Amino acid sequence: MFTKIRHVAIHTDDHFRMAHFYKTLFGMKKITAGMTDQNGNYDKERGHLSDGVIGLALLQRQPGISAGLDHFGLEVEDVQKVRDRLKQYYPDVFVAESQSHVPFAGLRTHDPDGNQFDLSQKGMANVREGYLQEGWDQPRWINHVAIRSARPAHLAEYYQKVFELRPVEGLSGNGSYYVTDGKVTIAIRPWDMISYRGLMAGLDHFGFKVENLEAAKKDLDNLATTTPASAARRIAIGRDGEKRQKNLEACKLCRHALADPDGVLLDLTD
């Protein structure tokens, strides 16, 4: 495939609590060394995690930055071809240089809705550490990233036309579109203010494929017992909690809905 989905980033106030959750439950491993802490200092104990394909960055949330899902990342065979397609079909889309400390990508861009993502190509100068490796297979891995959009068909066309992602047969419908790199999927689901007032456009959730859903649920329970601070959180609480959960469960790739210790929405399937 021309494009591979390779990166997801979250802003968090507690890197280590979140890292424990993703390492313990999903077997993710550290692939980079060193990230900024809450005081702006370099902490060599922090680093991006990986499931063997997708790098997960648990970034320190600083003042003025919202917690939760922030961006994702694509690796392409030819960045110049992407630039040419953007210039031809989406001239209003901006491409910027990444900051030098970013280990995954040399560029940052966005889709027509403004959802930002990193853009990488093998051989870029600042792609380093674990992102240079071939990776590995493991039984629990990130299989999709979900976006909410008021114009999902337009967004799906963008990811197909520019990045050559392909529709997933049998999944699209009811205003939702699922496009894939052959392994990982971008789910583009409708946004509106009818479902519930707090439903926001933009990055919505991401999900894991696991070897056995019941085994994963048992591991969730064990984590809650052994390390309560890193336990998953219930979604169906508060005024709109049940609506949020039902809305997440409507994702075609969801068999079990949950939230991580920070409240980032996740789903599991097997």
Where would I find each of the regions flagged by the language model?
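Short amphipathic alpha-helices within nucleic acid-binding modules
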Residues: 80-85, 213-220
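N-terminal beta-strand motif that seeds the catalytic metal site of vicinal oxygen chelate
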Residues: 1-19, 69-72, 122-156, 166, ...
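Short, charged/polar, Gly/Pro-enriched secondary-structure boundary elements
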Residues: 54-57, 66, 114-117, 183-187, ...
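Exposed loop/turn and edge beta-strand positions of beta-sandwich/beta-sheet ligand-binding modules
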Residues: 4, 43, 52, 68, ...
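Core segments of cupin and vicinal oxygen chelate
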Residues: 1-2, 9-55, 146-187, 191, ...
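Fold-core signature of tandem repeat domains
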Residues: 5, 49, 76, 119, ...
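Vicinal oxygen chelate
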Residues: 87-141, 170, 178, 221-270
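Residue-level structural signal for beta-strand termini and adjacent loop
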Residues: 36, 61, 120-122, 173, ...
